[in-house]
Amino acid sequence: GLVLGIYSSEKDEGAAQFTSAGDAFDRLVSGKLRELLSVCGPPLKKGKTRIFHGLHQDFPSVVVVGLGKKNAGVNEQENWNEGKENIRAAVAVGCRQIQDLEIPCVEVDPCGDAQAAAEGAVLGLHEYNELKQKKKPVVTPQLHGSAESEAWQKGVIYAEGQNLSRYLMEAPANYITPVKFAEHIEQKLRSFSNVKVHIRPESWIATQQMGAFLSVAKGSAEPPIFLEIHYLGGANTNDSPLVFVGKGVTFDSGGISLKPSSGMDAMRADMGGAATVCSAIVTAAALNLPLNIIGLAPLCENMPSGKANKPGDVVRAKNGKTIQVDNTDAEGRLLLADALCYAHNFNARAIVNAATLTGAMDVALGSAATGVFTNSSWLWTHLYEASILTGDRVWRMPLFEHYTKQVTDCPLADLSNIGKYSRAGGACTAAAFLKEFVTASHWAHLDIAGVMSNKDEVPYLRKGMAGRPTRTLVEFAARLSQDSHN
């Protein structure tokens, strides 16, 4: 199969304009493609397709996809590069049509941006069907022509990184337990000589005095793991690393503060923070990015049992602060509190944590963007600029003292794990809670609860767990590796 792009005609130009690959193919079939397009309905709109069979012996089926305006660039209103997004969406829908025809290979027009085209193809074809007997046919996307093969390959690596997090998030919680999560990541990193993976057991966690993390883990029969990854891509192994921290709750029932049963199965993806940061490191290693990265993922389940945290219990975090656990379902911040304390051991250039932390984040921004709470404008600028390119957007949220007061005003301990006014500003009080465990001057907390899954909002992702914002983290790390400022 073959997927070719076509731009929508500007008002006066009349005939729609092919990409250069589309033009070349049209010449190859003596203008037949343009002729067929002109007689088979209105001009192709952005994201719409036409499919033609039997035009050329090498390509039994050719899908023409609408790319929208030719010179679409950064859209200030939308905070993304519209041209790139249009290519991703169009290529994804074209590749899926080839897949529906059970054609095993598809060649993709680079559409002027081979990286975006590769991302659209690889992300658009991904589906989790490991556990089904009846599987969709596997389709391998390849670049049509050889002009932009380096950019294409980069796009494939970026997209495979996001697909790895989608896989980890989508898989059932009895398949991706804390131990199996860690083993899966270790196996992905085994071939890189500049990566060390430490799978720390419960006994190690206890010696580190991570009392908040352990208090959550003790409710489950699954043993907790603290996963620590060292990627040494920098010129000097002693260069200050970028530290990623990801919440790794492989299943979140809520604990004694039990969640409603409807939709609880989606909580198999409550390790989305760990999945995205670990996948970003796997991708950084595949791209051989020239910087050092450390990944930290506290992994456990949050379950109700005779051993579980009870509402009102007080636990002690690694830095000695005590926390009153007023709601056992605000557990992600307990794991992150200890992991953030530990992250300060590495003289980090920046600490970036990701977590499916609060339903309130989903209420605030929905799935349009990841909420970013940060104490560093320098860090924010890098994350924001990266997100414009990837189309996986971020939006800055407040870290006001206003919210800190609501978590420090606590009857029995230094901090309460939910804000004084419970639901009001829930994403912001959670961020304020985390800030109590951070002394680093460049720290960002990404609340990814709203972007955890995709219904149909992102056209190049199928319905299911989204693996967002993995590509933005990778692009951010790539930009950081070029920035000597700090």
What are these regions (language model features)?
Residues 1-248:
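Short amphipathic alpha-helical segment within the helicase RecA-like ATPase core
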Residues 28, 41-45, 181-486:
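A generic structural signal for tightly packed, nonpolar segments enriched in small/aliphatic residues
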